[in-house]
């Protein structure tokens, strides 16, 4: 870590969370070395979630153009250019956005990337890149959010499909694809529940993960990055309510999610440290992160192989689970037919 980087936080102003000094919110200790979180995405995601939990701040994965934004790539690209402040001053957000190769229909990508970085990664950057201590820092490069987009968390392409509407919601004539900005209201196995503002009208809808079309699929069968409008009837509302509740929590047969190699290493080391130092649990994450960074390539491969096998196990069990559901749904459909 260069000495130039370490001096940057001193340029920022202290952000007071309350008038009383006792209520000033302060930065925690780094959860891992910056070099480690840059090289290992699993360490990055683990420490980022823990960081937001410690800071009691909201954490979510933004969606741009119908795809989840890779915050690890965003963090790497911004920090290797000197951090948030430097990217803003040197106007390099368009350059950062070019790494993601957003679709041609995605607009305001630089604006959205900057906003998400400020909300989700700025304080994480201060702690892990610049090793900031004490009260929270506020960037000098002030972010002026457009009032019309200050609460928006997703950039999606809206393609009005040919669907059946109630009399109160007639289909629009001459509809075509265009880009709109909206908010993510919830997430489920197949996609996201979103809210999109089109002019003065606000539409609720479902943003599905686009599937790969088969040979027999018609052009209208797959709507990439499409927001499907819906009318909230009582029956529809109940069905969506069930989807919002995680199937993982409800169904005991749902396969156990896979863990990365670092997760296995973390669990192993955490167990050992807890038995040796039961009163120093707050320091374990940092110690384990340093231990992981000190492993040789061969030693690290042992855990990464375990993680790869666990990923294969999860994918195999997930395919079996989905096949079981498909057969069960098919049996139920056939039973209703008779």
From Swiss-Prot:
Predominantly expressed in leaves, flowers and seedlings. It comes from Arabidopsis thaliana (Mouse-ear cress). Residues 235-247 have a biased composition (Basic residues). One of its GO terms (molecular function) is DNA binding. InterPro entries: ARID_dom, ARID_dom_sf, ARID_HMGB9-like, HMG_box_dom, HMG_box_dom_sf. GO terms for cellular component: nucleus. Binds preferentially DNA with A/T-rich content. Required for karyogamy during female gametophyte development, when the two polar nuclei fuse to form the diploid central cell nucleus. This is High mobility group B protein 9. It comes from the Eukaryota. The keyword Transcription regulation applies. Disruption phenotype: Failure of fusion of the polar nuclei during megagametogenesis. Keywords: Developmental protein, DNA-binding, Karyogamy, Nucleus, Transcription, Transcription regulation. It is found in: Nucleus. Coiled coil: none annotated. The keyword ATP-binding does not apply. The gene is HMGB9. Residues 38-129 form the ARID domain. Residues 233-259 are annotated as: Disordered. Gene3D superfamilies: ARID DNA-binding domain, High mobility group box domain. One of its GO terms (biological process) is polar nucleus fusion. SMART domains: ARID, BRIGHT, HMG. The lineage of its organism: Eukaryota, Viridiplantae, Streptophyta, Embryophyta, Tracheophyta.
